[in-house]
Amino acid sequence: MSVLMSDPGERIALPLQVGDHVIDPPVVLAPMAGITNRAFRRLCRESGAGLYVSEMTTSRALVERNAATMDMVSFAEDEYPRSVQLYGVDPQVMAAAVRIIVSEDRADHIDMNFGCPVPKVTRKGGGSALPWKKDLFASIVHAAVDAANGRVPVSVKMRKGIDDDHLTYLQAGRTAAEAGVSWVALHARTTQEMYSGHADWSAIARLKEELDPLDVP
Protein backbone atom coordinates (compact mmCIF):
# COMPACT_ATOMS: atom_id res chain seq x y z
CA MET A 1 0.00 0.00 0.00
CA SER A 2 1.38 3.43 -0.82
CA VAL A 3 0.47 7.07 -0.58
CA LEU A 4 -0.22 8.49 -4.05
CA MET A 5 0.25 12.17 -4.78
CA SER A 6 -0.66 13.96 -8.01
CA ASP A 7 1.46 16.88 -6.79
CA PRO A 8 3.49 17.47 -3.61
CA GLY A 9 0.74 19.55 -2.04
CA GLU A 10 -2.17 17.18 -2.60
CA ARG A 11 -3.02 14.30 -0.31
CA ILE A 12 -5.01 11.42 -1.79
CA ALA A 13 -4.60 8.43 0.53
CA LEU A 14 -6.32 8.68 3.90
CA PRO A 15 -4.87 7.35 7.17
CA LEU A 16 -5.76 3.83 8.27
CA GLN A 17 -7.62 3.29 11.52
CA VAL A 18 -6.72 0.28 13.67
CA GLY A 19 -8.89 0.35 16.76
CA ASP A 20 -8.05 3.67 18.39
CA HIS A 21 -4.75 3.94 16.52
CA VAL A 22 -4.30 6.08 13.42
CA ILE A 23 -1.82 4.68 10.88
CA ASP A 24 -0.51 7.70 9.05
CA PRO A 25 0.90 7.46 6.46
CA PRO A 26 -1.21 4.38 5.54
CA VAL A 27 1.87 2.27 4.79
CA VAL A 28 2.36 -1.07 6.56
CA LEU A 29 5.57 -3.08 6.80
CA ALA A 30 4.43 -6.68 6.32
CA PRO A 31 5.52 -9.26 8.90
CA MET A 32 8.36 -11.41 7.60
CA ALA A 33 9.83 -14.31 9.58
CA GLY A 34 13.50 -13.81 10.27
CA ILE A 35 13.44 -10.26 8.91
CA THR A 36 11.12 -7.84 10.72
CA ASN A 37 12.95 -7.87 14.03
CA ARG A 38 13.53 -4.78 16.15
CA ALA A 39 16.65 -3.71 14.27
CA PHE A 40 15.01 -3.99 10.85
CA ARG A 41 11.87 -2.21 12.03
CA ARG A 42 14.02 0.64 13.33
CA LEU A 43 15.60 1.05 9.90
CA CYS A 44 12.16 1.09 8.28
CA ARG A 45 10.79 3.61 10.78
CA GLU A 46 13.42 6.02 9.56
CA SER A 47 11.77 5.79 6.12
CA GLY A 48 8.43 6.82 7.57
CA ALA A 49 5.98 3.91 7.25
CA GLY A 50 2.98 4.01 9.55
CA LEU A 51 2.87 0.47 11.02
CA TYR A 52 5.58 -2.13 11.55
CA VAL A 53 4.52 -5.71 12.25
CA SER A 54 6.78 -8.12 14.14
CA GLU A 55 8.06 -11.40 12.82
CA MET A 56 5.57 -14.27 12.85
CA THR A 57 5.42 -15.46 16.46
CA THR A 58 4.26 -18.94 17.44
CA SER A 59 1.39 -18.71 19.91
CA ARG A 60 2.39 -21.89 21.74
CA ALA A 61 5.97 -20.69 22.24
CA LEU A 62 4.60 -17.42 23.60
CA VAL A 63 2.34 -19.23 26.05
CA GLU A 64 5.30 -21.37 27.14
CA ARG A 65 7.31 -18.16 27.51
CA ASN A 66 10.15 -19.30 25.33
CA ALA A 67 12.96 -16.77 25.83
CA ALA A 68 13.59 -16.16 22.13
CA THR A 69 9.87 -15.76 21.49
CA MET A 70 9.43 -13.29 24.33
CA ASP A 71 12.24 -11.25 22.80
CA MET A 72 10.40 -11.27 19.47
CA VAL A 73 7.42 -9.54 21.08
CA SER A 74 9.48 -6.78 22.67
CA PHE A 75 9.60 -3.32 21.16
CA ALA A 76 11.69 -0.17 21.25
CA GLU A 77 10.35 2.63 23.45
CA ASP A 78 9.65 4.84 20.44
CA GLU A 79 7.88 2.09 18.47
CA TYR A 80 4.16 2.81 18.18
CA PRO A 81 1.74 1.30 17.49
CA ARG A 82 3.35 -1.98 18.58
CA SER A 83 2.16 -4.77 16.30
CA VAL A 84 2.56 -8.53 16.85
CA GLN A 85 1.74 -11.29 14.37
CA LEU A 86 0.69 -14.63 15.87
CA TYR A 87 0.61 -18.07 14.27
CA GLY A 88 -1.23 -21.05 15.71
CA VAL A 89 -3.50 -24.00 14.99
CA ASP A 90 -5.20 -24.37 18.39
CA PRO A 91 -7.97 -21.93 19.44
CA GLN A 92 -7.28 -22.29 23.17
CA VAL A 93 -3.56 -21.69 22.77
CA MET A 94 -4.20 -18.71 20.49
CA ALA A 95 -6.57 -17.24 23.06
CA ALA A 96 -4.01 -17.74 25.82
CA ALA A 97 -1.33 -16.00 23.75
CA VAL A 98 -3.64 -13.06 23.06
CA ARG A 99 -4.47 -12.75 26.77
CA ILE A 100 -0.75 -12.58 27.60
CA ILE A 101 -0.18 -9.82 25.06
CA VAL A 102 -3.19 -7.84 26.23
CA SER A 103 -2.84 -8.29 29.99
CA GLU A 104 0.89 -7.55 29.95
CA ASP A 105 0.52 -4.60 27.55
CA ARG A 106 2.92 -6.09 25.01
CA ALA A 107 1.28 -4.74 21.85
CA ASP A 108 -1.27 -2.29 20.49
CA HIS A 109 -2.34 -4.50 17.57
CA ILE A 110 -2.44 -8.26 16.96
CA ASP A 111 -2.40 -9.81 13.50
CA MET A 112 -3.02 -13.51 12.88
CA ASN A 113 -1.05 -15.38 10.24
CA PHE A 114 -3.13 -17.39 7.78
CA GLY A 115 -0.88 -16.57 4.85
CA CYS A 116 2.42 -18.39 5.35
CA PRO A 117 2.93 -20.82 2.41
CA VAL A 118 6.09 -22.50 3.73
CA PRO A 119 5.69 -26.32 3.69
CA LYS A 120 6.90 -26.82 7.27
CA VAL A 121 3.96 -24.64 8.35
CA THR A 122 1.28 -25.83 5.93
CA ARG A 123 2.10 -29.51 6.50
CA LYS A 124 0.90 -29.00 10.07
CA GLY A 125 -2.32 -27.51 8.76
CA GLY A 126 -1.29 -23.96 9.65
CA GLY A 127 -0.60 -20.75 7.79
CA SER A 128 -2.26 -20.49 4.40
CA ALA A 129 -3.60 -24.05 4.63
CA LEU A 130 -5.72 -23.38 7.71
CA PRO A 131 -8.66 -21.43 6.19
CA TRP A 132 -9.57 -24.59 4.23
CA LYS A 133 -10.59 -26.03 7.62
CA LYS A 134 -13.53 -23.65 7.92
CA ASP A 135 -14.65 -24.57 11.43
CA LEU A 136 -11.13 -24.48 12.86
CA PHE A 137 -10.43 -21.14 11.18
CA ALA A 138 -13.61 -19.67 12.64
CA SER A 139 -12.79 -21.04 16.09
CA ILE A 140 -9.29 -19.56 16.11
CA VAL A 141 -10.42 -16.13 14.94
CA HIS A 142 -13.31 -16.01 17.42
CA ALA A 143 -10.99 -17.16 20.23
CA ALA A 144 -8.49 -14.40 19.50
CA VAL A 145 -11.07 -11.63 19.18
CA ASP A 146 -12.87 -12.74 22.34
CA ALA A 147 -9.58 -12.95 24.28
CA ALA A 148 -8.63 -9.43 23.19
CA ASN A 149 -12.00 -8.28 24.56
CA GLY A 150 -11.90 -5.03 22.62
CA ARG A 151 -8.72 -3.85 24.35
CA VAL A 152 -6.45 -4.52 21.35
CA PRO A 153 -7.59 -4.62 17.71
CA VAL A 154 -7.15 -7.97 15.97
CA SER A 155 -6.66 -8.50 12.23
CA VAL A 156 -6.00 -11.43 9.91
CA LYS A 157 -3.66 -11.90 6.96
CA MET A 158 -4.40 -14.67 4.48
CA ARG A 159 -3.95 -15.88 0.90
CA LYS A 160 -6.49 -16.62 -1.84
CA GLY A 161 -6.46 -20.33 -1.01
CA ILE A 162 -4.42 -23.48 -1.40
CA ASP A 163 -4.59 -23.38 -5.20
CA ASP A 164 -6.99 -22.16 -7.87
CA ASP A 165 -9.27 -25.15 -7.26
CA HIS A 166 -9.37 -24.57 -3.50
CA LEU A 167 -9.99 -20.86 -2.99
CA THR A 168 -10.98 -19.78 0.51
CA TYR A 169 -10.48 -16.04 0.76
CA LEU A 170 -14.06 -14.83 0.30
CA GLN A 171 -15.59 -17.13 2.89
CA ALA A 172 -12.63 -16.74 5.25
CA GLY A 173 -12.86 -12.97 4.92
CA ARG A 174 -16.56 -13.00 5.79
CA THR A 175 -15.94 -15.32 8.72
CA ALA A 176 -13.20 -13.09 10.11
CA ALA A 177 -15.27 -9.94 9.64
CA GLU A 178 -18.28 -11.47 11.37
CA ALA A 179 -16.01 -12.54 14.24
CA GLY A 180 -15.09 -8.91 14.83
CA VAL A 181 -11.64 -8.37 13.34
CA SER A 182 -10.54 -4.82 12.59
CA TRP A 183 -9.31 -5.58 9.10
CA VAL A 184 -8.55 -8.37 6.66
CA ALA A 185 -5.31 -8.34 4.63
CA LEU A 186 -5.02 -10.47 1.50
CA HIS A 187 -1.83 -11.66 -0.16
CA ALA A 188 -3.41 -12.19 -3.55
CA ARG A 189 -1.59 -15.40 -4.41
CA THR A 190 -2.35 -19.02 -3.57
CA THR A 191 -0.23 -21.27 -1.38
CA GLN A 192 0.83 -23.15 -4.51
CA GLU A 193 2.12 -19.93 -6.10
CA MET A 194 4.28 -19.07 -3.08
CA TYR A 195 5.87 -15.76 -4.15
CA SER A 196 6.01 -16.35 -7.90
CA GLY A 197 4.15 -14.66 -10.73
CA HIS A 198 1.90 -11.66 -10.23
CA ALA A 199 -0.54 -10.96 -7.42
CA ASP A 200 -4.20 -11.13 -8.44
CA TRP A 201 -5.33 -7.59 -7.70
CA SER A 202 -8.85 -8.43 -8.90
CA ALA A 203 -9.16 -10.80 -5.92
CA ILE A 204 -8.45 -7.90 -3.58
CA ALA A 205 -11.24 -5.93 -5.26
CA ARG A 206 -13.65 -8.87 -4.92
CA LEU A 207 -12.79 -9.28 -1.24
CA LYS A 208 -13.34 -5.57 -0.63
CA GLU A 209 -16.77 -5.79 -2.25
CA GLU A 210 -17.56 -8.80 -0.06
CA LEU A 211 -16.57 -7.03 3.16
CA ASP A 212 -17.91 -3.54 2.46
CA PRO A 213 -21.42 -4.39 3.78
CA LEU A 214 -19.80 -5.62 7.00
CA ASP A 215 -17.85 -2.35 7.38
CA VAL A 216 -14.51 -4.15 7.63
CA PRO A 217 -11.65 -2.90 5.43
Stretch-by-stretch model annotation:
Residues 2-217:
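Flavin-dependent oxidoreductase catalytic cores
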